[in-house]
Amino acid sequence: MNMRLRSLWREWASPIVFALLLTQFGATAVGVDGASMMPALRHGEHLLLPTAEGWAHRLGLGGYRRGDIVVFKPPRGAEYEWRSDYRGVPLPWRYRPYLVKRVVGVPGDTIRIRAGQVSVNGQPLPEKETQAYWNTFCADTTSAPANSVAASPSRMNLPSVTVPPHSYFVMGDNRSPGGSLDSRAFGPVDVRDISARAVVSVWPLIRKASATPPCDGGPQPEERVTFSGHEEWNPRLLLP
């Protein structure tokens, strides 16, 4: 019996435990699902996360910086973000899916959005590439959601919000109509809900140089992006 247990541990349990420890306290990879981080990230990209760093931040050691791309779960109070299916397959439970967004505000920052322009502590957010990309296609600068800094529709007229301790204000790079559901809707995200920072895009290896998004605010925009241009090497560091 002991021999069987040792064999089971060596052949099955040990690799599984090692994999769990590696992904929880080492590094793991996640896929980008959707178009909310265009143009920086495209649907189907796979990102590498140093999960050990995420654990350190949750324990109060260091923190995320403005511009970091993070993977997190939306706040528990954001009921509309809870899911009961996975890729169309019904599940007997509800869960909060992981999202990928960019850190815009860190604890203590004051966030204000006017005419689509994000300001942090009174200074315009430096995002020239993002603004240039969406101004070329379909930047949303007028809708209430695009200019909200509140956690509920009834508070959308708040002129600004101060990020609480141990929390972060996150936004998607997609500034088209309905392009990203983020802290403009559900408010700042507690550090305990942030898994880690994405540091590298590792897949696919090759991609088309240009991506043209749909601008109708319709569902599943990631399925309607048009790719063109030459092929280029995709793996790259994700710098703030």
Predicted regions and their residues:
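Soluble "head" domains of membrane/secretory-pathway proteins
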Residues: 2-10, 25-31, 39-240
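Hydrophobic alpha-helical membrane-embedded or membrane-associated segments
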Residues: 11, 15-19
